[in-house]
Amino acid sequence: VAVIGAGTMGGGIAMNFANAGIPVTMLELKQEALDKGLALIRKNYENSAKKGKLTQEQVETRMALLSGTTTYDDLADVDLVIEAVFEKMEVKKTVFTTLDKVCKPGAILASNTSTLDVNEIAACTSRPQDVIGLHFFSPANVMKLLEVVKAEDTSADVIKTCMKLAKRIKKVAVLVGVCFGFVGNRMIEPY
């Protein structure tokens, strides 16, 4: 698994996979941002250890599952990439265009978008059948809800894989279609 973006959301998403024993490569274009993101994850784990929720050995085991990179080429062999970058369509399209070129055929390309059109993101790739939305709620390492956003061309296998993966990382998955705010944000918006 790879996560694009080592900020608050990207770090929280990566922790879900490390908690489930799944190795994660985190990508940031600047080394300082990558170092900061990995340090924040360690701090979160250390806080859990201080509260007695994890042992120090568990902290180290989970941290050992996390690696970082500043180059997209290091993501060539991953099975799933989750983009967790700034919520602007042009930024996301740039990321997905690059992932389309770099990632192996059949890799699932997922966006953590909370409101943007996953169909539009998928359309900038040559493999829209492999593109899906995986919307984690903040803080991603705590909140249980995961919106699995099926785009128009998302294949049944990709949907099935993402629903199974949600269970493995202890999320409650809700399959939704593309619409403004999906389900969670639509429910919250009136309040």
Identify the residue ranges that each predicted region occupies.
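NAD(P)+-binding Rossmann beta1-loop-alpha1 motif at the extreme N-terminus of oxidoreductases
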Residues: 1-44, 67, 102
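Short, structured coil segments at secondary-structure junctions
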Residues: 20, 126-127, 169
